[in-house]
């Protein structure tokens, strides 16, 4: 399944070089045997870094991404994550509608900021967003 997830992420021009070997905190949506959506999270203490959300064009506008975000947030909160962070170049409007707020990079907790996603995978032009999961 890891290879199929990587294929989907690459088809959407999302980074894969720094993915963990075991995708414990990744969720997939399937249609029969096909992966039609993926989302992942990296854990940094009480904070989560949402990453690698992708839905192929033929499956968009079917609430797949919304379901994946909602389930990931639910699981994160139930395991002690109090806030989610993300970087995006293309989906800030989408995540704003899901309750995420744009913040400055210097407002991100140090552990999250030192992740490979923040430190060298995503460009500095990417929007930084956060959502409090305890509200």
Language-model regions, residue ranges each:
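C-terminal "cap" of GNAT-fold acetyltransferases
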Residues: 108-135
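Conserved acetyl-CoA-binding loop-helix of GNAT-fold acetyltransferases
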Residues: 55, 61-74, 86
């Amino acid at each position: 399944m890891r290879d199929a997830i990587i294929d989907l992420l690459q088809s959407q021009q999302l980074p894969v070089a720094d993915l963990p070997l075991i995708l414990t905190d990744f969720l997939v949506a399937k249609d029969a045997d096909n992966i039609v959506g993926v989302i992942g999270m990296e854990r940094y203490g009480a904070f989560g870094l949402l990453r690698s959300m992708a839905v192929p064009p033929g499956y968009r506008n079917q609430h797949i991404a919304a379901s994946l975000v909602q389930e990931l947030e639910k699981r994160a909160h139930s395991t002690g994550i109090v806030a989610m962070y993300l970087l995006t170049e293309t989906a800030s409007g989408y995540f704003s509608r899901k309750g995420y707020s744009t913040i400055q990079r210097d407002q991100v907790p140090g552990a999250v900021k030192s992740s490979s996603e923040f430190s060298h995978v995503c460009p500095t032009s990417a929007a930084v967003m956060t959502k409090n999961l305890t509200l």
